[in-house]
Amino acid sequence: GVLLYQDQQTRYRTEVERKLSAVADLKVDELSRWKKERMADSNVFYRNGAFSKLASRFFQRPQDESMEKDLRSWLGRVQESYQYDRIVLFDASGEAHMIVADTKEPLSSATLQKAREVMAAGKSAFDDFRRNEHTGEIHLRIFVPILDGPSGGQPLGAVMLRIDPNTYLYPYIQRWPTPS
C-alpha cells in the first residue's frame, strides 16, 4: 500500500511539474512576443522620413495651429490604436513639446533624462518598469529617437510611448491557460 501511494505521488508530482513548466514556457514566449510587438510599434517613428519632416516643421513653427493639429491627430491615432496611455514628443534639447494623454501629471526627471539618452544613442530603448514620482503608478516606456532623415543623422527629438501594464500585461500574467 505504501509503495503504491509513493508511486502515485511521484507520478502526480511529475505531471504537475510538467504542466507548470509548459505554462512557464508559454508565458515567457508570449511576453517575449508582446515586447517585440511593442518595439515594432516604435518603428512607426524610428527612421520614418515623413514623421521626421513633420516633427521638424513643428519644432520650427510650434505656433502653427494646423501643423500642431495634424501632429496631435497622428499621435492620438497611434495612442488609441496601440493602447498607449501617454505619448510625449520631445525636441532635441529634451523639452516636451506635445503630450497626448489621458492624464495630466508632470513628466518625471527620469523620463526627461531617458529621452536625452535615447537621442544621444540614436536608437530606440524599452525602459523597465518605473514608478511615477508624482502619482506612484507603475509604467513601462519605449523611447524612440526622431532622426533627421530615414538613414539616420542628427536627432531632432524623441517620442516616448508609455504603457500602463494594467491594460494588458498584468491581466495576461495572472491568467492561467489550463484549469487549475
Annotate each predicted stretch with a short phrase:
Residues G1-Q63, G76, E80-D85, I138-L140:
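Juxtamembrane extracytoplasmic/periplasmic/luminal helical "stalk" adjacent to the first N-terminal
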Residues E37-F45, G76-A96, K123-S124, Q174-S180:
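Short N-terminal helix-loop-first-beta-strand/juxtamembrane motif that initiates sensory/input modules
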Residues F45, K53-A55, G94-D102:
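Amphipathic coiled-coil signal-relay and dimerization helices
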Residues S66-Q83, D102-K114, R131, L147-S180:
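Solvent-exposed, extracytoplasmic
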Residues A120-D128:
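PAS/PAS-like sensory domains
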Residues T135-I146:
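A short beta-strand signature within small-molecule sensing/ligand-binding domains used
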